[in-house]
Amino acid sequence: MRKHPILYEISIRPWLYELSKKYSKTISKIKEIPLEEFDILKNIGIDYIWMMGVWKLGKIGLELDQQNDYSKILPDCKKEDIIGSPFAITEYECNPEIGDNNDLLFLKEKLHEKNLKLILDFVPNHSAIDSPFAKSNPEFYIRETNINNLNNSKFYTTTGFYFDKDPYFDPWPDVIQFNYFNENTIEFMKNNLIKILNFCDGVRCDMAHLILNEIFIKTWNKQLENLNCKIPKNEFWEIIKEIKIKYPDKLFLAEVYEDNLSQKLINLGFDYCYNKELLDKLMYGPNEVNEYIHYKNENFFNHVAHFIENHDENRAIFNFNNIDKSNCAGCICATIGGMIFFNHNQFKGFKNKLDVHLRRANDEKENETCVQFYNKLMDIIKDDAFKSHNYYFIYNVNGNDLWKLIA
């Protein structure tokens, strides 16, 4: 058994569109997915499939997206190619476009039959603007209290619900922010998390660091004061340890972009956190990578997920602008210890990014050099030495050239 799993991200609605083309028939529902597709993934060594975007979405987000120009990403983009953000969730029910809740259970069952496990999204920070809970339970959200200030704003809706935001960036205009200094919100989201785990083997938690108390108060201090909210005694993510008492095998993966915050989330119970800093170092060059690895201990690497691309990042070959550099970075991420995180079609060497709001990327041919590289790499990391990760870092202190395992 592998000590650290290999995760493979798939955006489900674009994948269904891709499968429809591959099999020359309409495949739009979970139950219509040819099961041999999962055999392919298992045979190359995948352990977990993160099926991104299964939850019910609102209409407002889609309408906003349809006003955007995607021609730079997809020159021949048509209205039907725009499908809306998978993170503008109205409620944790299966998106009826792809099936129902029973179909999610069917998916988990079929994956288990092939010794695969299923990861689904938990998006804790926000809901879609048109979530039914915005009407039934407005106290769940961060709201503007000055009713005379409800003018057109990039920060909140005309009804005073604040758009979700990262403290360093502009708000996302298709989603509204939950208030984690409200006890009812905390209980509501805990119940949502437990509900999701009935359908899967683990969750990928979107922007998990933003609801840490210290980050939340930094982002929303003024609004929280106006709402007379006090900082909670506990962190929301302490629920992970409670869940693991009953369900010890449930996996928790955090999207987070700073190593110091990753460590806090790991301490709260996350199995793995994004290792975006390693990707940034890989972009700079070997000296930065060597220094980064030198100052991190193996326990840290055992709790992070290494990747060179995902749905947020550009394709690796585009970023590195060189297939050999991209492959080298992929090799490091797959052999350093910790979760190995691959993106759908990464092995094909595509350059064109699949935007999360679209059902397809701009067409291109597979890069045979990349295909052959990943065929070899996936065979290598099936070896027991990489499954156990019972090894130590050996530093090349003299800086001499060393023989390459993969040329």
Task: Describe the residue ranges of each PLM region.
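Active-site and adjacent substrate-binding regions of carbohydrate-active enzymes
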Residues: M1-A407
